[in-house]
Design a protein with these regions (language model features):
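RNase III-family endoribonuclease catalytic core
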Residues: 1-122
Length: 122
């Protein structure tokens, strides 16, 4: 647990945020393949909420930055910015992959699937 705490401290420094509840940060990085008991918590519920928050934040920014753009153009821009490809690229740029907690079988998955997992934690 000490090693995980040090790792999370490093992540907080990397992203420039400090979490009051480090358990939430740990949960946000825990893939369902990490089996820690029958009803082990993972990031899926947080991902659901995070996707909506990210979408809303990006939509609001696009709305302000492109005041004359029609809805269709805003939608295209939004979808590009919140896509799995974009989120995975951000995760890769930040090196978030090394912080994701997962079961060993994850290394056997196809690149497309691991890209989605990296995108999930953004």
């Amino acid at each position: 647990m000490v090693e995980l705490t040090k790792s999370l401290d490093g992540l907080e420094k990397l992203i420039g945020l400090s979490f009051k509840d480090s358990h939430r940060l740990e949960l946000a990085l825990t893939h369902s393949s990490l089996k820690q008991g029958r009803d082990a918590a993972n990031y899926e519920r947080m991902e659901f909420l995070g996707d909506r928050v990210l979408g809303l934040a990006i939509a609001e920014r696009l709305f302000v930055e492109f005041p004359t753009a029609p809805e269709g153009e805003l939608s295209v821009r939004l979808n590009l910015l919140v896509s799995a490809e974009t989120c995975a690229a951000i995760a890769d740029e930040l090196g978030l992959g090394r912080y994701i907690r997962h079961g060993g079988e994850l290394t056997k998955l196809a690149a497309q699937r691991t890209r989605n997992i990296r995108a999930d934690v953004v």
